[in-house]
Design a protein with these regions (language model features):
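Glycine-enriched alpha-helix->loop->beta-strand junction motifs that scaffold or abut catalytic
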Residues: 94-96, 203-204, 224-229
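Flexible glycine/acidic-rich beta-alpha junction loops that bind and position SAM and/or redox cofactors
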Residues: 104-117, 161-182, 236-243, 247
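Glycine-rich beta-to-alpha transition loops that act as phosphate-gripper elements at the mouths
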Residues: 164-166, 205-219
Length: 307
């Protein structure tokens, strides 16, 4: 329990309707006719002697129904009408549970700028273009309400994924482009602020899945607030890598998977306020010591990193 695959689809309806993408979606819903699924299944059956804890019954019980849920990724500047058309198509034609990935720009420029400044990220540069060009909060709420009603009518689940990465300006030649995308601990307060607004305005009834600075120190609070599933990436790019998942998994070892019972706006609000002074999220006043080592690190020499 507590684990599932999730399709990510985008970026426009015409592209999603293409035969190649449609075949991918249908293949995820039911892979029983997919050559690669049957090839892999047969390989397992033919090589059972190579495994200590895998039986014929285990292999035959692997469901071909891999995924029945899609997250809609939208490009910055995608019109709300296009977002709604795609989500409606996924719910009505593809009959999959659907989440829409939202952007931190829903907060408005003034809120985002002040929050970043207050947390020590005043050096992170961004203008108001994306805040004006992206989906506006006043358009998002009625759209999400309509899609929630449609999903209820179809007997499917609907929600949002909070949030996409946040476009900021390249100022120190960090990348050979004009923009780069902020993620990790600095994104957390922005993402949780979006979750707070939606939880409050939907009385906690809108499902929220999460990505944006989740790690060992905050993931239990996120889940306890009713926000899940949780996606992590930045924390695994740090020393320890995928081994960090073992530590995070231990946090949930004694927890039973529970049915969705709503998002607590109060808990989310408390998390936003706490993040503003949390050492794991604010910019350190003094530069932290470098995690880099001077010697070349072979693929298997990761034990020298200060995990």
């Amino acid at each position: 329990s507590g684990f599932q695959f999730n399709m990510s689809v985008g970026y426009d309806l015409d592209g999603i309707k293409l035969e190649k993408v449609d075949r991918f979606i249908e293949g995820m819903k039911d892979a029983s006719a997919a050559p690669i699924f049957n090839e892999c299944r047969q390989w397992l059956l033919d090589n059972l002697d190579r495994f200590d804890n895998l039986t014929k019954e285990d292999v035959e019980s692997i469901s071909p129904e891999i995924c029945n849920c899609a997250t809609l990724s939208t490009l910055h500047g995608c019109p709300p009408q296009e977002i709604e058309r795609i989500a409606s198509y996924l719910l009505t034609e593809k009959k999959v549970h659907t989440f829409i990935k939202c952007n931190p720009t829903l907060l408005g420029y003034e809120y985002a700028r002040k929050l970043m400044d207050d947390m020590g990220y005043d050096y992170v540069a961004f203008g108001d273009f994306h805040f004006r060009d992206d989906l506006q909060y006043t358009d998002a709420v009625p759209m999400l309400q309509r899609l929630q009603k449609l999903a209820d009518k179809k007997g499917l689940e609907f929600g949002v994924k909070i949030t996409n990465t946040f476009p900021v300006d390249v100022k120190q030649n960090e990348l050979p482009s004009e923009e780069m995308y902020m993620s990790g601990k600095s994104l957390y307060a922005l993402s949780m602020s979006v979750a707070q607004k939606l939880a409050k305005d939907f009385d906690g009834k809108l499902r929220i899945s999460y990505s944006g600075g989740a790690d060992y120190f905050n993931i239990t609070k996120i889940v306890d607030a009713g926000i899940w599933p949780v996606t992590m990436a930045t924390t695994m790019l740090k020393p320890g890598g995928y081994e960090r998942l073992e530590q995070i998994g231990q946090l949930f070892k004694a927890k039973e998977a529970a049915a969705f019972a709503g998002v607590s706006a109060e808990k989310v609000e408390a998390m936003v306020e706490a993040a503003k002074s949390d050492k794991h999220h604010v910019k350190a006043v003094k530069p932290l010591p470098s995690r880099k080592v001077k010697k070349p690190v072979p693929l298997t020499d990761c034990f020298i990193a200060p995990c």
